[in-house]
Each structure stands twice: as structure tokens, then as C-alpha cells.
Amino acid sequence: MGKRIFLFLLSNILVITTIGIVLSIIGSLTGVGTYFTANGGIDIVALLVFSAVVGFVGSFMSLLMSRWMAKMAMGVQVLNPDKQTLSYEEQQLVDRVYKLSRAAGLTKMPEVGIYNSREVNAFATGPSKNRSLVAVSTGLLQEMDDDAVEGVLAHEVAHIANGDMVTMTLLQGIVNTFVVFFARIAAWAVSRVVREELAPIVHFIAVIVFQIVFSILGSLVVFAYSRHREYHADRGGADLAGKDKMIHALRSLEQYTSRVKEEQASVATLKINGKKHTSLFSTHPDLSDRIRRLEAK
């Protein structure tokens, strides 16, 4: 879990830190976009605008690249029935995703892919409903029966139909905005108590340190929302495939939680199967709790 969380946070921190540094350099050279006043104070409105630009540009850049990044990170082989000959199993997978997508009201079918892994898992990603991807592991296709596979696919299609990637991006943009804003307020306060000649370098280092600390705190909000959206996708999957198939899929996944790979941090929040035990930094709730909620529906 620690490695996954570290990589997830690091990727987000690197994006907003890089953008922040670039904009700061541009501001210092041109005077455009700087948030310091003439007497060394802070222009709160200018800083808030600066923070929003950094925060939302970073999150939307990640969204636009999400499908490509997932393919690269997971080694996804996209199945295209119009350009290649598919095996019976591959064609069946594509047909199921298309059937569920039409039932969910999607006007453009998602890309369908397979990635080579013993883990029993699947994920959905993409910048919009019209540019989405549903991918499953070879382990899932080998271990699960047809009803369980359909339940898993319905869950992933529900994520796309619900627009979860865009919503997560907006939330991450808001969190990033506050991280950038308060990191610079705190760094400015620290730089005021050191010698004047040291203030610029202290401010620069303090911004990075506070940005890391506040990003960790802000990630708690993102992870909490990620757990919340899993319940919605479960309900959506039950509507598409049937409640019994969705519950059967989750029960089947319980048997394979030990196989869930944690190194693909960039798509951890997108997968249907998380780790067995939930913590504040978990992207998924306990499977047993998800099953109980569906049964009570």
C-alpha cells in the first residue's frame, strides 16, 4: 500500500510543482502572474488565481492523458474487431462491453483491451464518455465464470456512464488549488522570519515541502470520494447486469484480493478490486461492505 500511495502522490505533486515553477519563472521574468505586492506582502486574489491555474491545468492534463497513460502503464492490448481477427474469448469480451455500453446509454463504444497479469481485476478510464477504455486482466478472464465477468464489466461501464473520471478530475483540481494556495502562504510566512538574503531560497524550498505535506492531507479527500464512487458504480453495475451477477462478481473478487498489484499507482483508483482492508488511504471500500450494501438494495 505504501508504494502505491507514494507513487500516486508523487505523480500529482510533480505535475503541479512543475507547472508552478514554470509559471513562477515566467512571472519573475515578465512581471505577469506574480502574487507578491510591492512591499513584500501577498496579493491573495492573484495567488488564488495562480493556484487555480496550476491546480486545474495539472488535473486536466492528467485527464487528457489518462487513457494513453493507462495503456502504457498496464501494457494494454486494445481489441479492434474491425482491424484484427479476434479469438472467440476476445470477441465475446468486446460484445459484452458493447452490449452493456448500449444499455447504459453510451453513444460511442469504449475501447476494449486486455492486459497480461495474474491479478483478477479490471479498470475503466478516459477523458470522456466518448473517449473511454475498459480493460481486463488475463487473470480475470482465466479465473472468473461468465456471470462474474459480466458483473465486473457492468461495474466498469457504470463508471464511464457516471462520468467518474471527469468528476474525480474536478475534485483533484480543487484539492490541488488549495494545496498550491496554502503551501505558498505557509512558505511566505516562513521566509519572513529568516534573513532577507536567504528569503528567496527558503521560500522556494518551503513551497515544495509544504506542497508535499498538504498534498498528502488533500489526498484523504480524493481517496474518500474514490471509495464513495465505488458504491455508485456497484449500483450502476447491478442495474446493467442484474443484482445477482454484480454480487456474484464481488464475491468472486474476494477470493483474489491477494493478487491485486499495487505498483500501477496511476490506475489504482480506476480498478474494481482494491486491497482487502480499507484505510484512510484506500481507493476502494471493503468488498464485504460493498456486497452488504448491494444485498440491502
From Swiss-Prot:
Single GO biological process annotation from the record: proteolysis
Compartments where located: Cell membrane
Entry GO MF terms: metalloendopeptidase activity; zinc ion binding
Catalytic site: 156
TM ranges: 5-25, 44-64, 170-190, 204-224
Enzyme class: hydrolase
EC number(s) per entry: 3.4.24.-
Homology family: Belongs to the peptidase M48B family.
Protein name: Protease HtpX homolog
Species in which this protein is naturally found: Bacillus licheniformis (strain ATCC 14580 / DSM 13 / JCM 2505 / CCUG 7422 / NBRC 12200 / NCIMB 9375 / NCTC 10341 / NRRL NRS-1264 / Gibson 46)
Gene (UniProt): htpX
